[in-house]
Amino acid sequence: MKRDLLLTKIEEYKNIMPWYVLDYYQSKLSVPYSFTTLYEYLKEYKRFFEWLIDSDLSKAARIADVDLTTLEHLSKKDMEAFILYLRERPSLNIYSTKKGVSQTTINRTLSALSSLYKYLTEEVENEHGEPYFYRNVMKKVATKKKRETLAARAENIKQKLFLGDETMAFLDYVDKEYEYKLSNRAKASFRKNKERDLAIIALLLASGIRLSEAVNLDLKDVNLNMMLVEVTRKGGKRDSVNVAAFAKPHLEAYLSVRKDRYQAEKQDVAFFLTAYRGLPNRIDASSIEKMVGKYSEGFKIRVTPHKLRHTLATRLYDTTKSQVLVSHQLGHASTQVTDLYTHIVNDEQKNALDKL
């Protein structure tokens, strides 16, 4: 979703929310939570508050009037009834034959509500320095996580990674082959953004930074002499991330055309730009997702930017055999989340042995 449209929709949701949700929004914006995350959370709150009113658990006539007392006194059975409602309500997708929403969606809803309840019962302070209330019903609600072993995850994900020579082959495909599949009109559009698109893909493959971190990069955050980028990690922490040397020529090529191609002025600090009605704007996450999907589908298999992050992590572990180094590169506090890459590499080694 375009940033301007995203902010417009956020304002629409804020206009119907209770005052304490607006306080929550402001607090999380300072962390900072991404606008995308906050937008998704506001959608979940709207759905929850509408259910409270429809179920007569709140006597409010509108969402903005749902009071704190209602949230404080909701029981575990009430929350379980809400989960059951999510499971059994008709799907909003008219093309879907499924009844209810997926477990992933339910988990996202519960995560949003847990975040709100934690804020109201632990983080916020009233005029007496106390939270608004103390009873957190969300701590009693169990979530069902998708059961899948690391080996199964590795098997599912490795087909969507560009390992070994495929990393450079993918970049070469975008650079030298992709446009020959296009019409003359499509070629003109491709050539306009070719250097930028290659720079984005190269940076993701060479650093493993998250999509949101790439989107939010400013010019001052990129040091091509040191091959470092400064990013804001989850939780608002700043981090310096090393970038592999193969990305440098692509980043330099983009910078050489950035000013003239996108009409960038001094105040346009975003590193990756797009032209909207002739004016430079920071590129948004959805544009990068579509771009990566389009190129990767033509090359091998349609993937997301997050799979490029997995690609870097797997290649780095394959080279170093160090989970600590990989976790530092990805910005993880623990090596536990890097266990996946050991399984992928071990599978690749086994496949290589089978060919001997």
From Swiss-Prot:
InterPro entries noted in UniProt: CB, DNA_brk_join_enz, Integrase-like_cat_sf, Integrase_catalytic, Integrase_recombinase_N, Integrase_SAM-like_N, Recomb_XerS, Tyrosine_recombinase_XerCD
GO-annotated cellular components: cytoplasm
Protein keywords: Cell cycle, Cell division, Chromosome partition, Cytoplasm, DNA integration, DNA recombination, DNA-binding
Subcellular location: Cytoplasm
Catalytic site: 210, 234, 306, 309, 332, 341
Coarse class of the protein's main subcellular location: cytoplasm
Top-level taxon in the UniProt lineage: Bacteria
Pfam families on file: Phage_int_SAM_1 (PF02899), Phage_integrase (PF00589)
GO biological process, one term: DNA recombination
Ranges of residues in domain Tyr recombinase: 169-354
Domain Core-binding (CB), residue spans: 16-121
Family: Belongs to the 'phage' integrase family. XerS subfamily.
HAMAP family listed in its UniProt record: Recomb_XerS
Function in brief: Site-specific tyrosine recombinase, which acts by catalyzing the cutting and rejoining of the recombining DNA molecules. Essential to convert dimers of the bacterial chromosome into monomers to permit their segregation at cell division.
PANTHER family, A to Z: PHAGE INTEGRASE-RELATED, TYROSINE RECOMBINASE XERC
Protein's recorded name: Tyrosine recombinase XerS
